[in-house]
């Protein structure tokens, strides 16, 4: 299969790009992935609670609902959405080549690619984490918080930013109490989120505290968490039936490692004010190239930019035989 433009991703950036490209009659193909990077189609927004700061929704909207609406809108204009994960790409020459996880030896081609793969939640890899992962440990409170093993139990959230505050607030609906562990002596969360968290009757925030080890019961479920005060070195074992990580994200750039220029943290480098990457014809949008803002609205904005950049690129190169275009010479020249 050959396409003028392929979008890899399923979040606000990917679907906004798809909407613009489909309306421009460029017939975009969007690979939303099948649990790509361990995240369901829709990206990080599917793991959040109510979104209060996305324009157009004065009463707020749930993350999953917002992504469902974006997907429906991109499909309405003709975007072809494929629920497969792109496993490898070859950006050395145009048309670019790529293959999916389910058919790794069957290559497809595209004149341009928009990378909107987002970022994935970090894990601490504590002793016992692998054993009790999804048996008490999660990186998504919205996905897992309502399951029976967490109801009316003491739950722990690790992190000090807005995500941690949001996850903890969400978990108060189900847990008997929520303890938030913050490595430093203050929260990084915004003032409004910090105020809500610190004043919630079902939340306790423990500063200068880290997780050390996860322990479980004879049923194979998490039952305790060993924590340590980093100022005194004193350890304590907490009874806890749930542990939720909210400690940041890593950009999903393994797919293009060694082919696109990335920064020290692994984020794709784009030319300032654009979504152009180090390879002509490849564009990056959303959290995969944004480590500063990481908001749904900014992701959508860069998705729009990527679509317009791709449309301009395609119009300028439609007369050039794609099979003779070697992209290696332009790599790294931002």
From Swiss-Prot:
Q: Which UniProt keywords apply?
A: Cytoplasm, Disulfide bond, FAD, Flavoprotein, NADP, Oxidoreductase, Redox-active center
What's the cofactor?
FAD
- Alphabetized PROSITE patterns for the sequence: PYRIDINE_REDOX_2
The answer on whether this UniProt entry bears the keyword Transferase reads no
According to the record, how does the cofactor bind?
Answer: Binds 1 FAD per subunit.
GO CC annotation terms, alphabetical: cytosol
* One of the GO BP terms on file: cell redox homeostasis
Q: Which GO terms describe its molecular function?
A: thioredoxin-disulfide reductase (NADPH) activity
What Gene3D superfamilies does its record include?
A: FAD/NAD(P)-binding domain
Disulfide links within the chain: 140-143
**Which positions bind FAD?**
10-13, 39-40, 44, 53, 86, 143, 287, 294-296
Catalytic reactions of this protein:
[thioredoxin]-dithiol + NADP(+) = [thioredoxin]-disulfide + NADPH + H(+)
Q: What is its EC number?
A: 1.8.1.9
Q: Where in the cell is it found?
A: Cytoplasm
A Pfam family hit: Pyr_redox_2
Instruction: Name the principal localization, coarsely classed.
Output: cytoplasm
Q: Record's InterPro entries?
A: FAD/NAD-bd_sf, FAD/NAD-binding_dom, Ferredoxin-NADP_redctase_2, Pyr_nucl-diS_OxRdtase_2_AS, Thioredox_Rdtase
| Self-association and partners | Homodimer.
Something else the entry says is: The active site is a redox-active disulfide bond.
Name the protein family.
Belongs to the class-II pyridine nucleotide-disulfide oxidoreductase family.
Q: What is this protein called?
A: Thioredoxin reductase
- The gene name reads cys-9
């Amino acid at each position: 299969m050959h396409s003028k433009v392929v979008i890899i991703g399923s979040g606000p950036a990917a679907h906004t790009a798809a909407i613009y490209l489909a309306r421009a009659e460029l017939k975009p193909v969007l690979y939303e992935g099948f649990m790509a990077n361990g995240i369901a189609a829709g990206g990080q927004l599917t793991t959040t609670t109510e979104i209060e700061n996305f324009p157009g929704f004065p009463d707020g909207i749930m993350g999953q609902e917002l992504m469902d609406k974006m997907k429906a809108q991109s499909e309405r204009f003709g975007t072809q959405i494929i629920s497969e994960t792109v496993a490898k790409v070859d950006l050395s020459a145009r048309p670019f080549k790529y293959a999916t996880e389910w058919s790794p030896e069957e290559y497809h081609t595209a004149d341009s690619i928009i990378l909107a793969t987002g970022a994935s939640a970090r894990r601490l890899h504590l002793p016992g984490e692998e054993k009790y992962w999804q048996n008490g440990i999660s990186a998504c409170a919205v996905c897992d918080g309502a399951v029976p093993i967490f109801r009316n139990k003491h739950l722990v959230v690790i992190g000090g930013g807005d995500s941690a505050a949001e996850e903890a607030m969400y978990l108060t609906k189900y847990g008997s109490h929520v303890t938030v562990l913050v490595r430093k002596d203050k929260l990084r969360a915004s003032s409004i989120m910090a105020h809500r968290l610190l004043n919630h009757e079902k939340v306790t925030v423990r500063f200068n505290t880290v997780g050390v080890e996860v322990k479980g019961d004879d049923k194979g479920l998490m039952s305790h968490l060993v924590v340590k005060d980093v100022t005194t070195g004193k350890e304590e074992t907490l009874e806890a039936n749930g542990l939720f990580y909210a400690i940041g994200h890593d950009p999903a750039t393994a797919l293009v490692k060694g082919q696109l220029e990335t920064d020290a943290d692994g984020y794709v480098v784009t030319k300032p004010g654009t979504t152009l990457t180090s390879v002509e014809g490849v564009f990056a949008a959303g959290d995969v190239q944004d480590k500063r803002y990481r908001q749904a609205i900014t992701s959508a904005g860069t998705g729009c930019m990527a679509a317009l950049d791709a449309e301009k690129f395609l119009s300028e190169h439609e007369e050039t035989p794609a099979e003779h275009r070697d992209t290696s010479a332009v790599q790294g020249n931002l």
